[in-house]
């Protein structure tokens, strides 16, 4: 009897793994397509955007970790992130243009 050779399936390599990113490239791609920003989208655009988002996030978290450490805390709190964005001129300019700030305290309800 002849034996059948079993082919080993290759593991699927995600676009995030190919680009060595932690952020999900496929999800960024889906958001770009659903957002109707353009009729056509290059295959490298979501990879680049995911890389930029990952860079900004890691930069903010690194600075917030330093602020938390200097205040004697072991965890990063929203106040630490807020302080980083307010004290860093480039980050402040970036988030200032967004309109509504997530760092402002919410207005109390009248209920």
Swiss-Prot record:
Mainly localized where?
Answer: nucleus
Kindly give the SMART domains that the UniProt entry links to this protein. Answer: H2A (SM00414)
Task: List, in alphabetical order, the GO biological process terms annotated in this UniProt record.
Answer: chromosome organization; nucleosome assembly; sperm DNA condensation
Question: What cellular-component terms does GO give this entry?
Answer: nucleosome; nucleus; pericentric heterochromatin
Q: In which tissues is it expressed?
A: Highly expressed in adult testis, mainly in spermatocytes.
Keyword line: Chromosome, Differentiation, DNA-binding, Nucleosome core, Nucleus, Spermatogenesis
Query: What does the similarity note say?
Result: Belongs to the histone H2A family.
PANTHER family named in the record: HISTONE H2A (PTHR23430)
What is the name listed in the Swiss-Prot or TrEMBL entry for this protein?
Histone H2A-Bbd type 1
Q: Which organism is it from?
A: Mus musculus (Mouse)
